[in-house]
Amino acid sequence: MSYPQFGYPYSSTPQFLMTTNSLSTCCESSGRSLSDSAAAASAQTPVYCPVYESRLLATARHELNSAAALGVYGNPYTSTQGYGNYVTYGADASAFYSLNAFESKDGTGSAHAGIPQTAAYYPYEHTLSQYQYDRYGTMDGSSRRKNATRETTSTLKAWLQEHRKNPYPTKGEKIMLAIITKMTLTQVSTWFANARRRLKKENKMTWPPRNKCSDEKRPYDEEEEEEEEEEDSQKATIKNEKKTVDEEVVREDKALDLSDLEDFDTIESESSECELKQPFHHQPQDGHQLRQRDCVNDHCKDVILKMPLNSTVNQELDRTNICLKSGVDQCEQDVLRGRQRSGESKACFQQQQILDSKPRIWSLAHTATSLNQTEYPSCMLKHQGLSSPSSSSSSSAVSTPVCVIDRRQDSPVTSLRNWVDGVFHDPLFRHSTLNQALTNTTVSWATTKGTLIDSGSLGRSVGNPTNVKGQLPNIPHDTNKEFIAFQKSGSKMFCS
């Protein structure tokens, strides 16, 4: 019987067909030697007697019967052809193992060397199969874990380059990449996690932090990595917010400083020229500023006049009132004692430092004796018009105290009173006690001085000879003597 449809002829004699004689020959007792068995087998018909276990033979019979039932081999074989006896073995089953080389001492080769091995069965190897993983995603213990080579990582790098915006492969993509690169699933996941870390450290991160998906459970290393990425992103946002807040605070501080400077400029610019020039300093001939000395009050000693920038007019009035009240009597006593001892004039005028728009300091003596209206406003020279007619009429009467009071160049205290009355219109300065004190001071000044200063000496000592009026020509005087005396008195310190 031949089967040309399978591509090769089949012999009509079945391979497993064994007669009773041949079976009995194979199942002979073990007393016969190997050479005798071989001789008996060669004398008879060649018998194919492969050594199989009963389990394999039963399976083979089942397959043959099913194939015969399907009609592959035509009619099924009957028991007359000897198929009923090929499974039934005798009690001496060890006869099949009598052909071993270990039984015969003179056996030179294996008895199975001439039997061809069937090609239908191959051992199942996980590494050679298409899908190497079981349903839990793990490898079989027999397969070895391979290291990642340059060829395998090039495939992963290509996939990562194509998915730079979302470098998170799914489970199916990881399995596909693992099959292509012949790596394990854990190796692929770890490689992608490390690649994302490298890109993040190199500031080449072009993807937003990925949130956890509830429907897909990723490996532990991916979840841990994503948690780290989320924490890093949160820290970065917090740092950026702190930086922006600090920058805003610095900008606000700078803006406040600039606004303060602008307000200061506007305050200075709004001050008019008609305001009182109240801080003064004395300008003697040598042109140096004089410091205040020889004052009775302790707080007047070694005080240099400075201009305060942030004081108000009310504070100036209070300070001036206190200074005038406390200093008139003491200054008068100082002038009288000094004049009686050394014959030199000493003047002490106490004037506190007051606000002024210009940083120039003037002395009270220069202000009281100067009549230049271009240098001082008209409000500071209010009583000059009232005192000039009296000074012109006082040329005939020298001994009267009224004429002496009206003469501005004789008494600095009188000039101080006139100037203060012109600037500060306060009823306090018109009090009887203050007027009496000023009158007594003027009389004592006129009596102790002994001589009067003419216009030339006064002009040389003060610096304004053209505006001096009302001098008495009837009384002789010594110009050099008076000039020297006034210089000595002027060299002393005026306290204000």
From Swiss-Prot:
Acts partially redundantly with other irx members in neural patterning. Required for formation of the posterior forebrain, midbrain, hindbrain, and to a lesser extent, spinal cord. Patterns the neuroectoderm in both the anterior/posterior and dorsal/ventral axes. Does not appear to play a role in pronephros kidney development. Keywords: Developmental protein, Differentiation, DNA-binding, Homeobox, Neurogenesis, Nucleus, Transcription, Transcription regulation. Gene3D superfamilies: Homeodomain-like. Residues 141-203 bind DNA. The keyword DNA-binding applies. GO terms for biological process: brain development; cell development; dorsal/ventral pattern formation; heart development; neuron differentiation; proximal/distal pattern formation; regulation of transcription by RNA polymerase II. Residues 221-232 have a biased composition (Acidic residues). The keyword Flavoprotein does not apply. One of its GO terms (molecular function) is RNA polymerase II cis-regulatory region sequence-specific DNA binding. This is Iroquois-class homeodomain protein irx-4-A. Residues 203-246 are annotated as: Disordered. GO terms for cellular component: nucleus. The gene is irx4-a. It is found in: Nucleus. Belongs to the TALE/IRO homeobox family. Expressed in the neural plate in overlapping patterns with other irx members, which all share an anterior border of expression. At stage 20, expressed in a subset of cells in the developing hindbrain with expression appearing above the otic vesicle by stage 26. Expression in retina cells begins at stage 28, continuing at later stages and is limited to a subset of retinal cells of the optic cup. Also expressed in the ventricle of the heart from stage 36 (late tailbud) onwards. Only expressed in the pronephros at tadpole stage.
